[in-house]
Amino acid sequence: MKIIFLLQFTSLLSMLINAMLLGLGSLHVRWKNRRYEQSRWMLFAAMLILAAHFLAQMTLSVRASGADLGAVLNLLAYPPSFALIALSIYNIEAVHDNRRRFVAGIVGLYAIIVVCYAIGYCCNGSMRIGMWMYVMLALYICLVVYCICKASRQILVRRKLLETLTASDMLPHVRFAKTSVTVLFVASMTMPFVILFNKILVIYAPVILLAIFFFVLTFCNLG
């Protein structure tokens, strides 16, 4: 399990580096946009949540005790961090201020995930919650799909608006941002299946870390 520990340590450092890039990047912005800065700190919070998650995995040796235990902890930590990332995208791309409905959907789905964990814990007396883990997994996928649909719709609307109102030289920048978001979403959709198997996780996790780092760099370039 040494390789799992090294992977968790690498993930922890990666999230801290991402958070540092986002936090220090704010100091170099001369003219600040309110929505962009809101999204920056949403991403910053998401990176800190993930960093805290990997630190907990390391100190508690959860995944070393079993892939199922690690998966349960992942399913509790990933939804809020992914939701913050999706909300940061939505916050920038939305042409109208309709975030409350989006946030309400996210909070509702995550609340159900937590309730499922609580029921499984009460029924089994430990974090080995059996079939309830798969219920949590299904709900996480629903949350990811919900966020993808909402954010992608706003990206499409904004793209059409830019095509109509701005010069064409803005479009490569928009396509670059869309590509990074797509990579991140694909990683988020495949991750629930990977976390159940340690051997696959060791191979696939570096791809996820690179996708998140690429997304953070893209976000910083937008500023």
Task: Tell me the role of every PLM-derived stretch.
Residues 90-120, 131-140, 164-184:
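The cytoplasmic-loop to transmembrane-helix boundary for the fourth helix
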Residues 18-25, 143-159:
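Membrane-water interface of transmembrane alpha-helices
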Residues 1-19, 137-141:
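Hydrophobic transmembrane alpha-helical segments in integral membrane proteins
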Residues 67-69, 129-147:
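Alpha-helical transmembrane segments
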Residues 169, 175-223:
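Interfacial "cap-and-anchor" motif at the non-cytosolic start of specific transmembrane alpha-helices
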Residues 27-42, 67, 90-102, 126-129, ...:
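Membrane-interface helix-boundary motifs at transmembrane edges
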Residues 17, 73-84, 135, 139, ...:
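Membrane-embedded alpha-helical segments of multi-pass membrane proteins
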Residues 10-28, 38-61, 77-83, 108-120, ...:
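Hydrophobic alpha-helical transmembrane segments of multi-pass membrane proteins
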